[in-house]
Structures are given as C-alpha cells and as structure tokens.
Amino acid sequence: MAFLSLPILTALGAVVYVLFQLVYNLYFHPLRDYPGPLLWRASSLPWKLTLLRGTMHHDLMRHHQTYGDTVRIKPDEISYANGQAWRDIHAHVPGRPEFLKDPVRLPLAPNGVMSILVSDTRNHARFRSLFGHAFSDKGLRAQEPTIARYADLLVEVLREVADTGKSVEMVRYFNMAIFDSIGALSFGESFDSLRNRELHPWVDTIHKNLKSVAISHVLRSMGVEFLAPYLMPAELRGKRQENYTYAIEKLKKRMQKTGDQGDFWDRVIVKSADGNQSGDGMSYGEMINNAAVMVVAGSETTSSALCGCTYLLCKFDKMDKAVAEVRGAFAAADQIDLVSVSRLPYLTAVIDETLRMYPSVPGQPPRVVPEGGAIVCGRFVPAETRVGVSHLGAYYAPYNFSHADKFIPERHLAGAKLEEPFRHDNYAAYQPWSVGVRNCIGRNLAYAEVRLTLAKLLWHFDISLDEERTGNFLDQKIWSIWAKRELYLEIRTREF
C-alpha cells in the first residue's frame, strides 16, 4: 500500500465508512424491519435535502400512502400516521419519562435560554402556568374587544378594495389583521399594519428566520454548523437575530407600562417582579424568547387557518352553506361576538375540516424516545429514536378518513360521525393541536379569532375565488410553517 498517497487512502477510507454505514442501516440497525423508501432508510441525506427544499410534508404524505401508517424516514427516525401514535408519543403516562422534543431540531435561542417551545418538563410546566390565564375562557372574554377590533378593522379596510371588479390578494390582508391583533394581545399595542395598509417587516423576518433554522439544523446534524455564515444565502443571514431584536424592542416597551394591559404578560410580569427571585416567574431572557414564540405561533397559524377556510369554502362550493348559517343567525352585525359564533356548528366544522386538509402547523419536530425505550403502536422502539406523527400523512390517509382528499365539513358535525360514510373515520388520528401536556396552549384563542373574523367577513361580503390567479393554494412549501402562496378572492359588498 506504500504506493498509495495519503489523500487516496483517506478517500478510500471515507468510501468504506459510508458503505459500511449504508449496509448497517439497511440490514443491522435496530429499525431495519420498519418499511420505508430504500434511500431514506439507508441514509439521512434524502431527508435533509427534502427539509431544505421545503417539501417534507408532501413527501411524508406520499410515503405513508405507499408504505402505510408506519414509515422509517431516516436511519433513526420513524413517522406515524395513526391515532395510537398520538397517544403513545405525546400523552402523559404515569411512571414513564416524557418524550421530549428533539434538541437538535429545536436548538436554544441566541441568548441560550429556554422558551415554552424548547424546554424540559419542569420548566415547560412553569411557562404554561404563567401563560395559562391569558388563554383561559376568562382570559378570552377579557381579550374579546381586542379581537373584535381588528376583525372590524379588516372589514373596514376590505370595503376599500371591494366591488372593484378586481380580485384581492388576501394572504396579505389576513396577515395584517392577525399580526395587529397578536401584537395588541402580546405587547399591549398593535403593529398598525391595517391602519398603515402595509405589512410589518417582522412577518418577512419570521419566514426567513424559519428557513434559516432549517439550513442550520442540517449543518448542525452534520457537525459543520460553524459553516452557516458562509453557506447561508445572503437574504437569510442574520434573520434569527433580527427576529429576536424585534421581540426585545417590543418587550421593553411593554415592560415600561404599569398596571394590567389585558395581554399575555400581565400575570408573567407580576410573578417575575424583583428579578424573579422567587423562581416561579420568568427571567428577562425567558421573556424575550417566549415573546418571539408567541408572535409566530399566534399570528402565522391563525392567518393560515383563515386563508385555508376561505380558499376551501370557495374551491369546494361550500361557501353558500356557510354564509346561510352566519346570515341566518344574526339580524345585525353587532350581534356577532365570541359567544354567538361558538354556537354555529357548521362554521366550527369548516374550521375543523380546514385544519385537516391544511393544518396550521404542518411540520412538527419529532420527539425522542426516552432512556430504556418505549412501546409505540404495539412495537418496542429503542431509546434515542426520533418519532413523530405526520399531520398530512394521517389526515389524507384513506384508512383514516373517507374521501380524504375532499373538503367535507359535514364529517365533523356530531350526527354525521355516526352515519355513512363517516362513521368509520378515525378521528383519533386527527390532532391539529397535538395532545398531552405540550398541546397548543393557544387553541382556544385561535378558534376565537378565526370564528369571529370569518363570521364577520361572511356576514358583510360575498366572496368567490379567482382560480386562474390563485391556482392550487394548497400546493405550498413549508419551513415549520406554510410559505403561503398568493390567494386571490373577489370581494363584493353584500346587498341587503
């Protein structure tokens, strides 16, 4: 071997190592018996490329349609698409350690401290307790004037562009309305996007930050995250820090205010007085991180739901039925409030079916099987395996839902669940808000905002889809949240 140079020996060694890993992953790995596409079982490279392309949700859905409800999507990761997996992975089981979120997928914030999104069991409970009141029924009642204010302002702004004969790009308007609302609820002041008729730049930063996080994750998993400043596209550089800078600026202004503001921070600030010496509040760093999380979770998810509802109602000819329910329930617009819209069963069914076909958070970070391993869907899974449930994989599976590719709000009505063809639907597989102690804390707020805003729009306007300009709205990429394409709707003022 003396005639071989060191570079050649190094290259040969690398080839042998890669081949060994491929063979091991396919034939000797503890997960070798799980089905899945060959290249994905052999190497994590296809998974990483798919993550970077933003097509993970569609690829997982396709793999589940091919291989069934349990698919090996990386050498050390399994994706599920059934109701049992939600319970086995996410539900609290006495005496069993929690399946924590993958720390590689969700690293700590730039300041190195935790948030409600990335925290251990004890600290997550503390964060959730502090924010719990703001998302309770009592908290929602206190927040109703704020939610209604921005729904009404959206109606006012849309009157300016209605009846023109031209379709309106609604993603922008929904983003402005919900971002303003979540600004008021999060920091006690709006971002004034609707009043200025201009989307706040933080929204663009959020999307670019999440895309940069995906790139950083791939580099981190390869042990070369230090190359991120050199490999990150220019438009994404610094977006993570910029995202936190916005949160810092808004939080500082909020903390300068005295007395209750009727927002998410009232209880947190009281509990965190005197530098959080008692330990049951939050440190300043934790406040910053949670502020950034709340803005993303509270704005993008709700605006996505509104976009999905209006698109699917128009696309599948369900708009007339939804309009009839809303207009039949109210003699005047001022009768529309959070309590009254919660009594509209078809409107709620529309939201539920939208979240099945277009879940607000389509890509969730996997959980890590705790020490000692665990039983998932009747099979033992070794410790340190990554496991998760694919929303779209479960929701579009014909073995879970009849006519899974059709928008049928009726399937969510109480009586329909007992009748054909829906009585065999597996509703346990449908968990858009997740389950367990880490389910979405903002679920009630999201329902309230979507119900109220959608009801007001359907009461005031006749809405139809500009299919030629919109195309297939559901054909979108994701980087944690949807990279929404444009949604063009024709808006006409209702005739009385």
UniProtKB/Swiss-Prot annotation:
Main location: membrane
Cofactor field: heme
Sample GO molecular function, one term: monooxygenase activity
Binding site for heme: C440
Membrane topology category: Single-pass membrane protein
Keywords: Heme, Iron, Membrane, Metal-binding, Monooxygenase, NADP, Oxidoreductase, Transmembrane, Transmembrane helix
Gene Ontology cellular component list: membrane
Pathway of action: Mycotoxin biosynthesis; sterigmatocystin biosynthesis
Knockout or disruption consequences: Impairs the production of sterigmatocystin and leads to the accumulation of dihydrosterigmatocystin.
Disulfide-bonded cysteines: none
Domain of life: Eukaryota
Transmembrane regions: 3-23
A Pfam family per the record: p450
GO biological process, one term: sterigmatocystin biosynthetic process
Location relative to the cell: Membrane
EC number: 1.14.19.n5
Swiss-Prot/TrEMBL catalytic activity: versicolorin B + NADPH + O2 + H(+) = versicolorin A + NADP(+) + 2 H2O
Family statement: Belongs to the cytochrome P450 family.
Protein name: Versicolorin B desaturase stcL
Organism: Emericella nidulans (strain FGSC A4 / ATCC 38163 / CBS 112.46 / NRRL 194 / M139)
